[in-house]
Amino acid sequence: MKRAFHKGQILTLQIQDMAFGGKGIARLETEKGPFVVFVQNAFPGQTVEAQVVKCKSKHAECRLLQVLEQADFELELPHQTIPGAPYATVPIELQHEWKTDTALDLYRKIGGVENLDDVFQGLVPSPETWHYRNKMEYSFSEIRHDLETDEKVDDFGLGFKHRGTWWAVENLDADSGLFDPLVESTLHKVRKWCEATGLPAWHPPQRKGFFRFLVVRKSLADGGLLVNLVTTSDAPLDIDGFVDLIRQLWGDRVQGILHTLNDDVGERVEAREGQSKVIWGNSTVTEVLHGLSFGISMASFFQTNPASAERLYAEVMALALEGVESRPGQVIMDLFCGTGTIGQILAKHANVPVVGVDIVPQAIEDAREAATHNGVENVSFFAADAGKFLLEHPEYKGKLHTVVLDPPRAGISPKTLRKVMRLEAERIVYVSCNPATQARDLVELRTQGYELKSLKLVDQFPHTAHVEAVALLEKIPNLAS
């Protein structure tokens, strides 16, 4: 059957509505009837030019090429616009409205939640709308997208990947408004120093070059900076020159500088066989959450927006600790605990034991070390499989009052969810960075006898489509074993 449009076709569209994940919706009438077009990073009120990347009988997915007309409500920005902040020109209140409406639509359609008016507790905004990130990754490329001519040129570039490409970068010449003003307003000087060495930037299609990535991690607690320059091993790096440059540009805030060798052809910072070493200063910066300090290395996973993460964890604490102190002998479990951030925060504020469980032994070692450093005593960490935990530690059977889940974006697999059920917890606090997979998992949790009691959204990433969610589920009494 002939379709209304074909792959590669360029369309001019008026965006009328929003779908979850930052997809603008255009509705068209064709010879074959109503047709829906989704355009990533477009939003209502805009007229855009977009290219079809996938076409079905009644809908198409498009890549945004350019905005032809802005929406009436869009704001003028004091920052350089970047691909990673598609909503930067949208008033924050409207961003919250879109995130709420599109997320709740998922819980209705995918999760089958019929009582959202009763359980939804609103959206928690980020304390900071601008300069909230604590880490930024900049890419080098020999292919630069010129923002003035909107063309690709052969040139030394350092900045962000141009939207829809993996090979071309847009030079960052000014503060983007998301990270650190000092770092980003002087990044062009780092680019010029690297270019002056005569060594080439990475050429993604040809898979060759020298300079690959510059990663900067920042402590929001004290402003300290950790810098990692990623190169191939094709030539020696002028280490002294690079260290002098970074310290001159960013001063006493620089706490450590690393050099990572990465000869992998893939477009990622971490190399499978490369090595990373400290060439000046320390290997970590210190971040503080709820009065606890955490040493964060360049490779550590840590919340990107610490100020908003404090609000997220405050919501988790309120739910996890509710009623537990009136139940002597009960325990709270932090499942998939990683390096134990949530578990330590809970333990600091609880008068009950907290148990952290993760299948990765190194993560558990790091969690124990961090708890010792913070003086948190009523938390125990175990390297164990969730499904076997009660068999290996029968002393906790019947004592798990609340289990806190914080899985990756993919959510919880059915197999893992069955393991969670074996823990026989009375309550589950489910933290999610992807409401779509959380909504899917709520269906299975409901069939296993858990009822959704409350749901709250948390805006961790202003100016993007991302939103996090915290859900409380309780075992239905008449189904409890």
Task: Set out the residue ranges of the language-model regions.
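Conserved loop-to-beta-strand segment in the C-terminal subdomain of adenylate-forming
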Residues: 59, 222-226, 465
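Internal alpha/beta scaffold segment
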Residues: 166-212, 233-259, 265
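Rossmann-like S-adenosyl-L-methionine
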Residues: 2-9, 20, 24, 234-481
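Extended interfacial segments that mediate partner engagement and assembly in macromolecular machines
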Residues: 65-203, 221
